[in-house]
Amino acid sequence: MSRALVTLLLLLTATAAAPAQDGATSADWPHYGGTQASWRHSSLSQINTTNVKRIAPAWMFQTGDYEGGLQITPIVLDGVMYISTSRNRVFALDAATGTQKWQYTYPLPRSFTTFYGPWNRGVAVAHGKVYMGTLDNHVVALDQNTGKEVWRINVEDANQCGC
């Protein structure tokens, strides 16, 4: 048998033996639904039927924004949890300890009012940036490590959109 054929057979065997992706996430939760396919399932096994009755909170973090509550899915990537609040604030927290790494507050105009409430649906994290949609129809990109604003763009005039 030729060397190329043996190599091909080994590659095919290794590929066939690889487990199929079940849609579960690892320690990270990088998207709204966990994975890009929104499986909303974690493969972590620290919490199970034998210990679920004994678990207790590891840490707590108060954002200070209580109007409307949090209506977001925390994003966890590389040990950092990213959350946003109803008043356009973004926090980066150490996911293991809850220690705040940085905070960003988007400056809403004082005269700004909204018909639909002050809710924010969360952030997206990719390419070294944290992206947030704001109440006045901007998209803001923040540096993932520092929380400094990198850029912002106005998507729609908040007074014209009927919001």
Task: Give residue spans per PLM region.
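Residue-level detector of Asp-centered blade-edge/turn motifs that repeat once per structural unit
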Residues: 76-78, 125-127
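Short loop/turn segments that connect beta-strands within beta-propeller blades
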Residues: 94-97, 143-146
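Bacterial N-terminal signal peptides
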Residues: 5-15
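Extracytoplasmic beta-rich repeat domains
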Residues: 61-73, 103-124, 152-163
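Blade/loop signatures of beta-propeller domains
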Residues: 21-57
